[in-house]
């Protein structure tokens, strides 16, 4: 790890299932970035302390997944999207403050558009099954 290398992580509990490091480190290598993407298994009772000191752990940002998204919203400065969904899944520092957003809805809709183009034409009602960020 270089002196100026950037580190980002996915924070989950458990975290072993996450393929995020594999995916992100592939693209980091492809673009020859001096960065690393790691996995952090943080239990719910330790999450507030970990997030409050994210920078002290060497991170410039993080992706958040189950079961921490709602807590992340409360511990950061969320944008409108995160507030609307009630959960945060992407964190970064700006002006030394930890900010957050939510990309679940955007990702859900992008996948729906890719699989079923025009799905929303003439649509007035829809049923979304689930309780995650995409369903909100």
Predicted features and spans:
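Short, glycine-/small-residue-rich phosphate/pyrophosphate-handling segment
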Residues: 103-104, 124-126
